[in-house]
């Protein structure tokens, strides 16, 4: 049973449009995402890097524009891991009719470079981060520079950019960062759920209540649908595999076992499970849910396939 909501009082009648947006792609080993043994020796796969736009709020009330994660800058990471088709947030968001300036809130699932590394592209957005995540990375970065060898640092910094911590600290000083402590309703109908010591120190996923029922935007707590369908953690994480299994159970209970309502971090199968289309860049857009009164952004509406199971 999911913990009770805290923060904004009684549950409201809320509704959100939900668009997962790919902003680049990478060719990576399958067992990195699907897990050792089950996906060992299966070669590589092209996976999307995704952030998810949520637009809505209380029905009949103020409407919000929130982004779950914000990608990374097109800097050394692109060359290090061979990312292809990287695009500016302005071009990506424009496909569903929004601009970076419209984003009020960035809900950071965790502080890996591809999830927090481009928040400065959204000048009006406040960041929501779990305090356990911020303190965990602060501690490990300090320890790495004081005590670790270069070989030991390689794993620590394999997906974390210390400069993102510097920029986040500047955001704290400027009042742009809101720290979450555990479970908290951050916007009407959007609740942060702490997944402590799972993918990272203080990862979180977001339960989104709509008129079509709940959805879960989970970041890398669930890389692929197969992780949560088969209860099999991935091959790469900083936390505990057993803790990840507990989080999978919580998500499944929240969604009443309707796994298609999960928005995973890097699964190309999301494009097949939901109404989606291909941009000229080769990146894709999914339209998982439309709030009441909203209209599809897909150029060809005849192929509409929104799944509400």
Where do the model's predicted regions map?
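Conserved beta-strand hairpin/beta-sheet module of binuclear metal-dependent hydrolase folds
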Residues: 25-91, 204-220
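Core dinuclear metal-dependent hydrolase active-site scaffold
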Residues: 18-20, 51-60, 179-211
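Binuclear metal-ion centers of metallo-dependent hydrolases, dominated by the metallo-beta-lactamase
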Residues: 248-309
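Metallo-beta-lactamase
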Residues: 2-6, 73-76, 87-98, 102, 132-194, ...
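Active-site metal-binding motif and surrounding structural segment of the metallo-beta-lactamase
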Residues: 83-129
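Basic, amphipathic N-terminal segments that precede the first structured/catalytic domain
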Residues: 2-46, 183-184, 206, 290-307
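Active-site flanking residues adjacent to catalytic metal/cofactor-binding acidic residues
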Residues: 68, 109, 129-130, 217-220, ...
